Amino acid sequence: MNGYGSPYLYMGGPVSQPPRAPLQRTPKCARCRNHGVLSWLKGHKRYCRFKDCTCEKCILIIERQRVMAAQVALRRQQANESLESLIPDSLRALPGPPPPGDAAAAAPQPPPTSQPSQPPPPQRPAAELAAAAALRWATEPQPGALQAQLAKPDLTEERLGDGSSADNTETFSDKDTDQRSSPDVVKSKGCFTPESPEVVSVDEGGYAVQKNGGTSESRPDSPKYHGEQNHLLIEGPSGTVSLPFSLKANRPPLEVLKKIFPNQKPTVLELILKGCGGDLVSAVEVLLSSRSSASAADRT
């Protein structure tokens, strides 16, 4: 741009200037150069006065630009094909890398053909294991044996969750009766893990047992079993969690947290659930760990 505010520099006669170091070449407009005008190419294409010129020199420039664009496209295609030929077929079948920030990005993805044996997970506290097992038992559908019993007309899912029933009885097989007659504590089918010794031993329905059509009687070998209350008491070093049996699998996780932790504020439970990514078991573990830390601070 000259002193008069025009972006064009008209070529004149040679002007004597002192010699200086050669600078980096600045791109110029070829069409303006054909017509004796020197103009910088940056931001000039839309405003070039000769952009619609159809003289022989400008037509030659157009053809040359088309040839250069075709050559660049061909070179890019050849470069992509050469890169694809270098990659083996085994690497092409692998999935792409996970997005940054994902928690699973830290663990390497094993190949789909080989499945190496994974090391056993570290042991967690007994209260966390008990809460996780109880939540899985309450939220997941029951196994086939329990589903066959639930299919009977005299014992429905609503009757299991209803506390107003007078008898609260349930029919069991001879195998369960033999296990119940043993002096050992009866193990829970869906909630027992070897790492959690404090898991409560409760049957599927949590009700009294009717043997040989007689009167219902509660089990004396399970101290944490209550026939009058439809709740599962989970006791551990961090406290006791009361889990109602009437929880259904279609309940939202926030409602389940409100039932398990009635003393906590709903807003706090919602924030913890969002922080755990909607995982109900992780949220219960966080709440139990916070409760254990608070009790330890009170003792000190």
Curated annotation (Swiss-Prot):
GO terms for molecular function: DNA binding; metal ion binding; sequence-specific DNA binding. Residues 89-129, 157-226 are annotated as: Disordered. Residues 29-76 bind DNA. Its main location: nucleus. The keyword rRNA-binding does not apply. One of its GO terms (biological process) is adult locomotory behavior. Residues 251-286 form the DMA domain. Keywords: Developmental protein, Differentiation, DNA-binding, Metal-binding, Nucleus, Sexual differentiation, Transcription, Transcription regulation, Zinc. PROSITE patterns: DM_1, DM_2. Expressed in the spinal cord, in a small population of neurons located in the ventral horn and around the central canal. Residues 108-124 have a biased composition (Pro residues). Residues 172-181 have a biased composition (Basic and acidic residues). DMRT3 is a marker for a subset of spinal cord neurons (dI6). DMA domain interacts with ubiquitin. Belongs to the DMRT family. Probable transcription factor that plays a role in configuring the spinal circuits controlling stride in vertebrates. Involved in neuronal specification within a specific subdivision of spinal cord neurons and in the development of a coordinated locomotor network controlling limb movements. May regulate transcription during sexual development. This is Doublesex and mab-3 related transcription factor 3, truncated. It comes from Equus caballus (Horse). The lineage of its organism: Eukaryota, Metazoa, Chordata, Craniata, Vertebrata.
